[in-house]
């Protein structure tokens, strides 16, 4: 399995914000978001091949009881289901962070953190028009999102760049044809720097208050800035 990095930090996003966690970041992604904050795991994937026992040994070096399987897109990694099972067999709480473009296929986890991508994620022309078409065709898979929501404890987390994005989100939720509690929908300001996030935080928080969604910050930027291993 190609692993970009394994590190111990504080969960900075979502309903488990503040929880000490070991992050296992797989390398490789089937999308190319233009604002991606981990291009070394997506646009230009890099990493080392590691076996499941090697990954588990590194996880066990840390005192945390929460593990986050992230990427890139962890659901396209070979042996991801076996890794998830092995992590949970050791008694860890496992969160899988995914864009929800790949069906769960029975994978085990304690929290599915689903982050479907909006129109604002469309890549620029760095990789030419082919990737833009691939990204747009794949970024929103309502049947896949529905399978995750119906089968797992979940949170739906959307990256918001402008107020109009909220209307797009509400349209996506409507197309799921499910009763999604608003407190399980998290809106997060787009930005790879603290300044960018703060610039969007105040109006997004007000939108969350008005619509009943949950606001989520990017605590890791407050604590560590935009750097790897955090």
Can you name each region flagged by the protein language model?
Residues 56, 75-230:
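Conserved AdoMet/S-adenosylmethionine-binding subsite of the radical SAM
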Residues 45-72, 76-78:
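Glycine/small-residue-rich loop that forms an oxyanion/phosphate-binding "nest" at active or ligand-binding sites
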Residues 20, 65-66, 92, 110:
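The start of beta-strands in P-loop NTPase/AAA+ ATPase cores
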Residues 25, 70-71, 98:
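A secondary-structure boundary/capping signal
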Residues 23, 66-68, 155-157:
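Short aromatic/hydrophobic contact patches that present stacked aromatics
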Residues 40, 71, 116:
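Residues that line or immediately flank small-molecule/substrate-binding pockets and catalytic motifs
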Residues 1-54:
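Canonical Radical SAM [4Fe-4S] cluster-binding loop centered on the CxxxCxxC motif
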């Amino acid at each position: 399995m190609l692993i970009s990095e394994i590190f111990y930090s504080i969960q900075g996003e979502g309903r488990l914000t503040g929880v000490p966690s070991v992050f296992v970041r797989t390398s490789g992604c089937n999308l190319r978001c233009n604002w991606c904050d981990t291009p070394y795991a997506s646009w230009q994937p890099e990493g080392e091949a590691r076996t499941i026992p090697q990954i588990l040994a590194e996880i066990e070096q840390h005192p945390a009881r929460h593990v986050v399987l992230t990427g890139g897109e962890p659901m396209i990694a070979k042996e991801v289901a076996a890794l998830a099972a092995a992590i949970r067999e050791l008694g860890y709480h496992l969160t899988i962070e995914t864009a929800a473009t790949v069906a769960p296929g029975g994978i085990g986890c304690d929290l599915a953190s689903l982050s479907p991508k909006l129109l604002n994620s469309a890549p620029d022309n760095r990789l030419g028009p082919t990737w833009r078409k691939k990204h747009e065709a794949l970024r929103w898979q309502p049947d896949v999102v529905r399978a995750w929501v119906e089968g797992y404890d979940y949170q739906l987390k959307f990256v918001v760049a402008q107020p109009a994005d909220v209307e797009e989100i509400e349209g996506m939720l409507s197309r799921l044809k499910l009763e999604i509690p608003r407190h399980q929908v998290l809106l997060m300001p787009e930005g790879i720097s603290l300044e960018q996030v703060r610039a969007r935080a105040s109006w997004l928080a007000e939108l969350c208050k008005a619509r009943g969604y949950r606001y989520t910050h990017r605590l890791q930027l407050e604590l560590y800035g935009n750097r790897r291993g955090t």
